[in-house]
Amino acid sequence: MKRGSLLWAYMAALAAGAVLAGQATGADPIKIGVVNMLTGPLAEGGRFTVNGLQLAQEEINRSGGVLGRPIELLTEDNASTNPGTVLAFSKLFTVAGIAAIVGPIASTQVQAASPAIAKAGIPTMIGGTDPSLTRVNNRWVFRARPNDLYSSKVIADFGVNTLKLKKWAIVHATDAFGQGGAKALTEALQALGVNPILDQGYSSGTQDFAPIVLAVRKSGAEVLGTYMTYPADQAIFAKQLRQLGVNIQWVGSPTTVTVTARNLAGEALHGTYAVVDFNADANDMTRAFTKQYTERFGVAPDNFASWSYDALHILALAMNNARSTEPEAVRNAILAIKGYKGLEGTYEFDRNGDGLHGYSVVRNEGGKVVFIKRVDFPVE
């Protein structure tokens, strides 16, 4: 979808949500800000985020809203950039009555905005998985996805103990997500007695991966572990990897099986493994959501849609439980959530603000994502 079409589609969705909110109740709406990628290289993922939020907003408002009031979403485009994210947050912080914010999925964007979020003191749900994001003394950031301390352990364990492979090459973006993931994966492998034989970083938006592919081939690696931020980068890398004759096993982060990456890469990603926070076939809830989403939007959902859907529902639950939209009350109510079943898993927030603590392993079989196993970790 072109950027202009995406933006117009999003505005139409907002209008539909506003009408629905008006139908739910005549009370003044509760304002929730959204910082999302409507333009730029992550705009396709932003479209899935829009759709997930729209479905959640409709469900919440149909069921009576929050504290008897409808939810209104106020969205700012971050243009898929760090400066755009900081600007988007600053605009939302000036809006009177913002009760909470659904922030970005990209770790580097969350990292850029974290000081401003801490200063504003507004509860903010994030989808970025860099472990450090909830460990920087920012009491207003809460994660609605599992972080990469968990994904790295699952990737390492599956590759070493299930696939029985010990010669690892790690390829990652050099942003917060990629570097955080690569560091965590290296540590997880070392805990299993394995030292990676290659670590290669790249800048997001790279078009020529040939030097990295050749380095992987020359290294003699048996298995590839990846933390790649942009689905388009994932697809380009996969195609160039296959074109240059590298067909080793591959266990990647969730980007590996996003709808966008699979559509762009086609056969180049067939046979690869990945860890995922959202599995469409995990249970009755995810299957029902996938059916509803696909019928509504004409494409299957991925984690961009599932995490934003869960994030809005969690905020609504916290405000209802707190019987308040006051920031401190909402913060405490989020941290008190235990056993809430969402699309991404069962939420139990720890003291850092992390709500999920496990991943599933899946395989791309001919373009279809097939479940292999689920791994959960104790809440610290």
Spell out what each predicted region is:
Residues 2-11, 15-17, 22-380:
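Extracytosolic ligand-binding ectodomains
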